[in-house]
Amino acid sequence: MTKSTELRQKDVAGLKTEVKELQKAHFGLRMQKATQQLTNTSTLRSTRRSIARAKTILAETIVKQGAKK
């Protein structure tokens, strides 16, 4: 899980790749849960929240860049 301060230091491309990586990880966790291989189901929730956090910071970054132009 990455912290908000670490995410805010990344540029737009870095944030987009972070979101994609988190979504892939979340998909893998969902498949593990479906096949009953996942023992710690709280990782699903934390991954989902990390995705939301990264998307929020991505949107904020895009708005800031638009305001600077």
Curated annotation (Swiss-Prot):
Q: Which UniProt keywords apply?
A: Ribonucleoprotein, Ribosomal protein
**One cellular component term from this protein's GO annotations in UniProt:** cytosolic large ribosomal subunit
Q: Which SUPFAM superfamilies match?
A: Ribosomal protein L29 (L29p) (SSF46561)
BP-aspect Gene Ontology terms: translation
Q: Which InterPro entries match?
A: Ribosomal_protein_uL29, Ribosomal_uL29, Ribosomal_uL29_CS, Ribosomal_uL29_sf
Molecular function as annotated in GO: structural constituent of ribosome
Annotated disulfide bonds: none
PANTHER family, sorted: 60S RIBOSOMAL PROTEIN L35/50S RIBOSOMAL PROTEIN L29, LARGE RIBOSOMAL SUBUNIT PROTEIN UL29C
Q: Which family does it belong to?
A: Belongs to the universal ribosomal protein uL29 family.
What is the designated name of this protein?
Answer: Large ribosomal subunit protein uL29
Traced from the root, the source organism's taxonomic lineage reads: Bacteria, Pseudomonadati, Pseudomonadota, Betaproteobacteria, Burkholderiales
Name the gene: rpmC
